[in-house]
């Protein structure tokens, strides 16, 4: 783990999800897309700019690499931080979609499933409606273009049937 950190601001529920899954400070897996994105945008620190940290910012460890040693390359510009935040938000959306896409199978309401998902992923339940609406917008945007990703057939565990 690197002792160099970068601070990026996120929506509160994404910050909670990050800290729950990757610790505080956040340390991504070695070969992850997030680390690749961070490494891609790392540059030398321009001049003697001090690192500023906002109240809601999440501390993320900068991955070390042979091509860009963290001692020299430890700065992300404002736009680079936005790009890394987009990459992390995509990972969040992927997990939300994968975990809730087949919710029709369990015969419960979407809101109760989202609340359970929040609890399982370290997110305050106060964001349940926000995440429910996010999920519904994702699903509806596909449906609008004629792509129905909901399961239509019954999944059977028993292979004899």
Where is each model-derived feature located?
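Positively charged, polyanion-binding regions of nucleic-acid-associated proteins
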Residues: 84-105
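Short, basic interhelical loop/turn and adjoining N-cap
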Residues: 116-132
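Long, low-complexity interaction regions most often at the N-terminus
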Residues: 1-80
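Alpha-helix N-cap/helix-initiation sites
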Residues: 89, 107-111, 124-129
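Short, charged amphipathic recognition helices of the HTH superfamily
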Residues: 101-121
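Short, basic alpha-helical nucleic acid-contact segments in DNA-binding proteins
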Residues: 134-149
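Intrinsically disordered, low-complexity linear regions
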Residues: 64, 134, 158-160
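Intrinsically disordered, low-complexity basic tails/linkers immediately adjacent to helix-turn-helix/homeobox/MYB/SANT
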Residues: 148-161
